[in-house]
Amino acid sequence: MTFSSNPLVDETFMAPAHHLLAHYVRNRRKQNTGLSDERFLTWGVMRALDADESGRAFLQARADQAESLPRSTWFDAFKSKRRLEMLTEVATKSYQYFDRELGDRDWLAEFEELNDHPVWAVDGHQIAHATHSERDGKGRYVASGMIYGLCLHRGLMRPLARFQGDAKRRHEWPVFKENWQRWLQGEPRQLMPIIVADPAYVNNLYWVLEKIHRHAMIITREKENMEPMIYGPCGFDPDDPINRGVVSDDHAGYSNAALRRIHYRDPATGKDLVFITTCNHLRPGLIALLYFLRWKIEKAYDVFKNRLGVTKAWGTGDTAALMQAHFVALLHNLLTVLLARLEHTGLSETKVIDRQKKRRDKLPPDKQVPAQNNVRYAFALTCQFIRTVRNALRYKIPWEDAYPLFKLRMESYL
C-alpha cells in the first residue's frame, strides 16, 4: 500500500471488489445512471458496515450526504436474480483473489501437513426475521438462518446456503449436504478438504464414504449418546509438544462406521473432550487444535452481530438473504485484507497481540498448549479497527490523515 498520491480511504478500500467486478464478472451490466452494479456493490458493503438500524435509515444517511436514491430502487434490487448472480460471482472470485493476496498470512503456517488442504470451519448463523416476513403455520416468525464457512488458513468468510427463514424451518445438516460440494468448487488447494463442524454435522457413514470417494474429511465432537467400541490404539508420540493434552488416540467402531477417536484433556482447564474424525494422517493434537479453531467462526458471528450491527434480515426471500450474506462476508474479507495491507506497512493489532501474550504468560508451563501458541493472526476484527474504517469511509478521510489514526487505534485501547 502506498500513500504517496494520498487517495481517500474509501477509494482504496473498495478497489479490489470494483476491479473484479469490472474485469472478471460476466453478469455485470454497464449503466451510468441510477443504481449501477458498481454503486450497488459499494452500497451493499456500506449497508453492512454503517450499522444503521434499518434500510430506510441507511438510505436517509446516504441522502443526507447528497447520495440519494429512490427507496423502491434500492429495495427492488434485492429481488433481482441477475444482481444476485453478479454479486455471487464477485464474492467467489474475491475469495480466490484475497486468498492469494494473504499468502503469507496463514493461521496454520506452522503445520506443513496442512499446507495443501483446504480447512473450513462450518456452522449456521441466525438473525432476526425481516419486518415483512411471513409467519409459520403456528403464527410464529422464523429467524433467518444462513450457513457460513470460515477458512482456517486465511480467516476469510463465505456464505454457503440459507437453511431457514420466511416461515420455513430446516435443519442445517441436509442443507449443508445439498450444497457443500458445489460451494468448494474452484478451491485453490490441491488436497482433500477438511471440514471442521460441531456435532450437528455428525453422520459417520456419510463422512466415511465421502473420504473413500476423496471428497472431504471431517473433524467433529463425539455426541454423548454415542457408544463406541474401541478396536485398538492408532499410536502417537506423547513427547511431541503438539500432542500435549492427548490422552488416547484409537480406532473406534460406531453403529454403522469406524472412525478415529481422540480423547483430549485440555491442559489449561482440565476439561475432557472427545473428537472423532476421518483424518488419519494428522497428529492427534493437531486434530484438537483445528476443532478449537472452529470457535473462530463463532467469533466472526459475534463481529457481525455486535460490532457491525447486522442483527436483522434486510428483506424477505432467499435472494435478499443470500445478497445480505454475501455483502456481510465480503465486508469481513475486505476488512481482513485491509488489516493485512496495514501490517505490511509496519502496523499490527499490537493491543490484541500483547493481551494474548499476557494471558498466555499467566499460565504455568504445564497448562500451556504449544499447538495453540503456534497459531498466528487468528484473532477477531476489533471494535476500534472497524470504527476507524467506518469513520474514514463515512467522512471521506484521505490516507495521509487516516494512517496515524489506524496506528493509534491498533496500538492501544481507548
Which positions does each model-derived feature cover?
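An internal, acidic/charged active-site-proximal segment
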Residues: T92-F98, L160-K271
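Active-site-proximal, Lys/Arg-enriched surface segment
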Residues: F75-H153
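Short, conserved catalytic/metal-binding motifs centered on acidic residues
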Residues: W43, F58, P70-F75, V119-I127, ...
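Short amphipathic alpha-helical "interface-anchor" segments enriched in bulky aromatics
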Residues: I287-G315
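A short, flexible helix-boundary coil/loop motif
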Residues: M1-Y24, Q31-G34, F111, I212, ...
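Short, charged amphipathic recognition helices of the HTH superfamily
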Residues: L49-D64
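Short, basic interhelical loop/turn and adjoining N-cap
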Residues: K30-T33, A61-D76
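Basic, amphipathic alpha-helical segments enriched in Lys/Arg and hydrophobic/aromatic residues
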Residues: G315-A340
